[in-house]
Amino acid sequence: MIMARKRHYLAKTGRDHGNPSGAAGERAPRGDAGRQVPRGDAGRRVPRGVTTGGDVTGDLSVDCDVVVVGSGAGGATMAAELAEAGVDVVVIEEGGYHPTESFTADSMRALRTLYRDGGGGMAVGRPSVLFAEGRCVGGSTVVNGGMSWRTPARVLERWSAEGVLAVGERDMEPYFERAESRHSVGLQDPETIGRDSELLKAGAQARGWAVVPNRRSQLHCAGTNNCSSGCPTGAKRSMLVTSVPRALALGARLYADCRVDRITRAGRAVTGVTGRFARGQALTVRAPTVVVAAGAIQTPALLARSGVRSGQLGRNLALHPNTTVVAFFDSEVTGWQGVHQAFQVREFMAEGLLLTAQNLPPPMLAGIVPAYGRELGELMADYNRIVTAGPLATDTGTGRVRNIPGLGTQVFYRLTDPDAARLVRGVELTGQALFAAGARRMLLPFDGAPAVRSPGELRNLLARPVPKASMQVYSIHLMGTARMSEDPRRGVTDSFGAVHGVRGLFVADASLFPGPIGINPMETVIALAMRNARRLLERRADGGLLPG
């Protein structure tokens, strides 16, 4: 059924990820959008308006109204919203342009081409935390699971109490609705749900726990479970197939394979950015407004390189620490068949714990489980009989992003004792659910821990202290390093992403979050970008993109 769904989708759509916005895309293109379609690296055709590193033969200099650094959830949304209002927008993306038809189940290739550092970023600490960032046109939305949830009301209330303006539920409602409409947010078609998700659901329900179907940005997902390698059908509504083509159709220009090195300034006002393509050619963009949406690691790094001075810049990193239990079943699970993460166990949200099942390709799984040599080989030999699941924790500790001479951008993170205890609790709960679903044994995410074969063994093992240094922790949700606050002493930007003390400079990604939100952050990023784009346009209509 899943493969039939995939074939039907491909036949119906032709894997076309052109402009999804209907009449809005009929507007005559401007600038580079009207030139002949070039061929990018590897000979692939790219849309009008996109310039890749393979197209560039010399240094380039361009002018625009707004330059956006980054093409992920925040950057692409901001670009599309501004372009729709008639603003001349240039988007710069460090990663490459990879169309839907180039995506396959080859996860090693995906790690090389779609992720920064091959998906092997590291926040140094005890334990160190492995993290992954997308680095391609569309950003991390190309390689995430497409989970789309509104910011929890309690989080918005906390932000409001901390003095962030216009982030109450009523304020954010129209932006959530717009984000969900633009990105086809809804429930998964039931025939595409895989057995790994069903097993976690069954085990949780057997224990009487609350389980909810996941809300995802998808349009009749085919259930190929290739989310982390790029959706091969275009059904996942990443920025690559939504806001990027929408912005291009409205006249925006996009330069891929180009790293922005610095934001240029004249006094307190920005004047644009400078950067280099992967093959060394320089790009200079002159613009009175710069929007930085490079993610919670690269955004503070770029701001710091560009002379932004704030006591909060690069601090307050939250990352929703995750860990994974590997459960072995007697019968085949074939977790790679079916949608990525179909359900969420929400029984323990008040404790700051969210439990999910997420099948991971072997190269990615190998990086986050404490199995080596023969044990790892045996695990992979049983790959078709395993369920990988685990907790996401709302962290209370924080980390920091720093530019260190000779070492580049470095990340540091402190897992607090309460957060470590929360993860251990999440591992025990996950194990209880999977044993209730019929698991025969489990590997736990702690170095040196033996396999457990019963709920009693699990309970007894975790009743003893688990050294933090032994924990295998990873993250895909990075946030908070350029947080919003009306008080420059407490935040890098104001409530709408305008950087304090610099005219024309904005932030539009999860760096803005004043703290962790305890849920997948993509829809929050999109909604805030839509909200902040509107405020930017209002300021522009008042005579300037940013008041002095």
Model-derived segments and their meaning:
Residues 13, 47-159, 166-170, 309-331, ...:
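N-terminal glycine-rich phosphate/pyrophosphate-binding loop and immediately adjacent elements
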